[in-house]
Design a protein with these regions (language model features):
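N-terminal periplasmic/intermembrane-space "pro-region" immediately following the signal or transit peptide
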Residues: 47-50, 69, 109, 125-182, ...
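C-terminal cap of metal-dependent C-N hydrolases
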Residues: 86-125
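C-terminal helical cap
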Residues: 30-35, 83-97, 483-487
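Histidine-rich, glycine-flanked metal-binding segment
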Residues: 21-25, 38-78
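Bacterial N-terminal signal peptides
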Residues: 6-16
Length: 544
């Protein structure tokens, strides 16, 4: 429908329309809104080179030599943004969804029009040479739910012409899928490490790390649209191609997000617990291939429950709290399954005017009645490896975890740190305390910047300004991380492990990336001091 409207509107402009002198073949248009779904829109910047649409991005686009930069000043774009083709779209000075008169009187409200590369109208003002010098751009609305989808949403979400997207009178949706291919190699391992975990050469080789698929969309039966999320994963590949488990499939994320107000919503279903930025963020959006040993050991991946979340202080603060009981997957009754109460609060003590520089602080806590005991263990941040530290199952009258987090992001630079402490009230082993922390740094060499999600208090995926399919180099990111975990206390010798990790990520496009991780691992356990070095290569492909 949007394409049809744009075609009809553009057809109404003839070559005699007066236009400001602009070369439509080489132009940058900044500060323009496009529809992302019926309930939201995003602000983007557009680059047209040699009469073809080369780039549409939420990130800054510098003005190349010989180009003209125009400021759309928050205008609303209707048309078809198809990369590699001559542009055909119109920019209106208002949102036609809020005021239909904008469409009825395009002679007044159209500020820019181009049809198959031919300029039909332009009354936009020239913009400054860089986005930083331009007027303040409108801020895009964030994802409605507290926990974003497991995969990045495309910017063209809501385009029912795409085969994997749909739209009816009361629903919208998009089908997403991802496959992750890994190759593991262990260059070295000392004899103490072999005594602790065995010969790591048996864990070398390739594997399909995961195959995930699902759908996310909106339900428009209510004043504020509800968001549904359904995702599953096959486990057959990670289980060594066992014939009797080839069809194993786990629904790991199914929930409804119901907004009460513009700043508060309720999520019900199987979902991530609201604690730790690293845990809430999608795995495919982190700078390293796997989460830290600290997060994997102490915090569950997902649980069944309800989360109430919202923002305060003009979105400088986010909060979330929930109750969880995983009786559906445990096979036990609610009374015989552990019940947990979880909460998280984040705060931005500093945000620059253009939001390119910010400081994030967060605190989270988790309390469980310990009905199913406690058990903390983890691999050395490689999926294809044995557990290096392990407390073994512990009886428990209750257990708790608390989390401290801090992040500083300035443009392409990101520095993050988290601490997690875990306490167990064990009738046989006494009061036990375990802990761990990590410090992670990321530098996007090509200059892109991760968006900050004010609703959830997390950072988003790495944007790709110019993919290899557009003649660019894609996006390159360097990452480094140090993590430490201590699972030894009292009579429990779960071990202590420190890991230094280095990584390089190459995002060829928003849906295709390859990366390489190196880790140096030291492990003190069972009276031995083991060390090992591991390397993992990964290919990630997502369905567009």
């Amino acid at each position: 429908m949007r394409r049809l409207i744009a075609t009809l509107l553009l057809a109404g402009y003839v070559s005699t329309v007066t236009a400001q002198v602009v070369d439509p073949q080489n132009v940058v248009i900044r500060n323009v809104y496009v529809a992302a779904a019926d309930a939201e829109h995003v602000a983007i910047n557009i680059l047209i080179r040699d009469n073809k649409l080369e780039l549409a991005s939420k990130d800054a686009i510098p003005t190349p030599d010989g180009f003209v930069a125009l400021d759309a000043n928050g205008g609303y774009l209707i048309g078809n943004l198809k990369l590699g083709e001559a542009p055909s779209f119109i920019i209106l000075d208002g949102d036609p969804r809020e005021d239909f008169d904008v469409l009825l009187d395009t002679e007044t409200h159209a500020v820019f029009a181009v049809h198959q590369g031919a300029l039909r109208k332009n009354s936009l003002l020239y913009a400054s040479g860089t986005l930083d010098e331009a007027e303040e751009e409108p801020k895009p609305r964030g994802w409605l739910a507290y926990t974003p989808p497991p995969m990045a949403m495309p910017t063209n979400y809501g385009d029912e012409a795409k085969w994997n997207q749909w739209k009816t009178k009361n629903t919208t949706g998009i089908f997403l899928a991802a496959v992750v291919l890994d190759r593991q190699h262990w260059p070295s391992q000392n004899s103490d490490s072999e005594q602790q975990v065995g010969d790591l050469e048996f864990f070398e080789g390739g594997e399909i790390r995961g195959f995930r698929l699902g759908a996310v969309g909106t339900l428009h039966y209510f004043k504020r649209p509800w968001v549904y999320t359904v995702f599953g994963a096959t486990n057959a590949f990670d289980k060594g191609f066992e014939v009797d488990r080839q069809d194993d499939f786990t629904w790991f994320d199914y929930r409804l997000d119901m907004p009460f107000t513009d700043s508060m919503s309720l999520s019900v279903g199987k979902q991530k617990e609201p604690i730790s930025m690293e845990r809430v963020m999608s795995l495919v959006q982190l700078p390293m291939q796997e989460r830290t040993s600290v997060s994997d050991a102490f915090l569950p991946s997902r649980n069944f429950g309800a989360v109430l979340s919202g923002t305060a202080l003009n979105q400088r603060m986010s909060w979330a709290g929930g109750l969880f009981n995983n009786f559906i997957d445990s096979g036990h009754s609610i009374g015989n399954t552990a019940t947990a109460a979880i909460g998280r609060v984040t705060w931005l003590p500093f945000v620059s005017e253009d939001e390119s520089n910010l400081l994030h602080l967060g605190f989270g806590a988790r309390f469980s009645n310990g009905k199913q005991g406690a058990h903390y263990f983890t691999e050395p941040e490689f999926n294809k490896s044995p557990n290096f530290v392990n407390t073994d199952p512990l009886d428990s009258n209750g257990n708790s975890q608390f989390n401290l987090e801090a992040s500083w992001r300035r443009g392409p630079y990101w520095l993050a740190a988290e601490f997690i402490g875990a306490d167990v009230d064990s009738p046989t082993s006494g009061d036990l305390s375990f802990s761990g922390y990590h410090v992670t740094g990321s530098w996007i060499l090509t200059g892109e910047m991760r968006d900050y999600n004010f609703k959830s208090g997390i950072l988003g995926p790495v944007p790709v300004s110019r993919s290899v399919y557009q003649g660019g180099w894609g996006t390159w990111e360097l990452a480094a991380r140090y993590s430490s975990i201590d699972l030894t206390d009292g009579l429990i010798d779960g071990g202590e492990m420190d890991i230094l990790s280095l990584g390089v990520n190459w995002y060829l496009s928003p849906i295709f990336n390859v990366n390489l991780n190196y880790r140096f691992i030291t492990n003190d356990k069972d009276g031995f001091s083991g060390d090992a070095q591991g390397v993992m290569s990964r290919v990630l492909l997502m369905l567009e």
